[in-house]
Amino acid sequence: MGKEKGHINVVVIGHVDSGKSTTTGHLIYKCGGIDKRTIEKFEKEATELGKGSFKYAWVLDKLKAERERGITIDIALWKFETPKYNVTVIDAPGHRDFIKNMITGTSQADCAVLIIGGGTGEFEAGISKDGQTREHALLAYTLGVKQLIVAVNKMDTTGWSQARFEEIVKETSNFIKKVGFNPKTVPFVPVSGFQGDNMIEPTTNMPWYQGWQKETKAGVVKGKTLLEAIDSIEPPARPTDKPLRLPLQDVYKIGGIGTVPVGRVETGVIKPGMIVTFAPAGVTTEVKSVEMHHESLDAGLPGDNVGFNVKNVSVKDIRRGNVCGDSKNDPPMGCASFTAQVIILNHPGQISAGYSPVLDCHTAHIACKFAELIEKIDRRSGKKIEESPKFVKSGDACIAKMVPSKPMCVEAFTDYAPLGRFAVRDMRQTVAVGVIKAVEKVAPGAAKVTKAAVKAGAKK
């Protein structure tokens, strides 16, 4: 076996009718995690139902249906490989909680693939004023997804028209520029997700197509297919050199072992023997051991979902939403308030000071009050439009001071991105998203330091 391939997460965005499922299904089907047996089973069902042309979307529909019935499907089904990477498709959108998932970041996307329907009228619908496409692209950008690929789909329905492709490239370039991307760094690939043109193999139907190119720090990169474009994603910097931040997903009590917090390492490294602090609980203790998939680790790295055993801490002391960090290296703290840039997505009324919805930030789920609307800003440029507005409504962006209703631990987006973005939930939907600019931290009072931590500290 050669060196293991790098791992990247790709989020697929675009209007519901752009052919996202077919395109994603095609890649997963041809390069991916769906085993032959499952495919044969699906093909047989498709034929029996008269869907004999076996659209790739059928694969995705099946997976989605199973997922929505609460059958957890082996997540490998949402994976495919390129020569350089193992790619995970994050929660193919169209899914209710897409926005929430993208923000609370079960996994942060390294790149977004924007699928545009090339058919007449489709493209226009997708990026009209209220288009979903605009919202998703803006979200991706706001939440720190800085790489983008545009696939112009359904080229087969345009008679493989060069003029139509060029028109869409021009319009889409303007559109993504407004969102914040630089079109020169974005590959534009004409494809047919259904027929397979330019997906994995170069097409023969578009002799005019010379290939895509994008500018990178290292120079110009060129290619033909969508698979090559995904393969050319620049590898993400995994933040191992930052101080540890590990938001807890759960805390278990395991007989004979003790208390075992579980969560995903977002930044830094967790190792046995480390003295860690949990915020906002203010508990400090020693890490006895670190495990992943029931195997003990010398170190848990960013992206790893780990369980770790802590000494002399009861399950009552720490909980989901707490953040674990290194007590000697910028330990996490609770916050009294924080300032954030908030984009209102869909709220039926007006939001003014005093509004207290629930915030989902990393694994925390806590009501926070909009204590003060500091200024209304242009959501693209970030420039101030109005000082101390009385209210904001859907489509607006503002800088607001937020006060959590109970202790919580968050960070500025520029310091620790995964702990610096949040979704505002109300009426069972995501009404706004935000990025934290600054945090007013609270030094813990008489915090609990376990005997194990004191002993281990004295040894050092």
UniProtKB/Swiss-Prot annotation:
Region annotated G2, chain positions: 70-74
Region of interest (G4), ranges: 153-156
Disulfide bond entries: none
Residues reported in the UniProt entry to bind GTP: 14-21, 91-95, 153-156
GO MF terms, alphabetically ordered: calmodulin binding; GTP binding; GTPase activity; translation elongation factor activity
Chain positions found as N6,N6,N6-trimethyllysine: 79
Region ranges (G3): 91-94
SUPFAM superfamilies listed in its UniProt record: EF-Tu/eEF-1alpha/eIF2-gamma C-terminal domain, P-loop containing nucleoside triphosphate hydrolases, Translation proteins
Cellular component, GO, one term: eukaryotic translation elongation factor 1 complex
Residue segments, region G5: 192-194
GO BP: any one term: cytoplasmic translational elongation
Source taxon at top rank: Eukaryota
Domain tr-type G, residue spans: 5-240
N,N,N-trimethylglycine: residues bearing it: 2
Job description of the protein: This protein promotes the GTP-dependent binding of aminoacyl-tRNA to the A-site of ribosomes during protein biosynthesis.
Record-linked PANTHER family: TRANSLATION FACTOR
HAMAP family documented for this protein: EF_Tu_A (MF_00118_A)
Name this protein carries in UniProt: Elongation factor 1-alpha-A
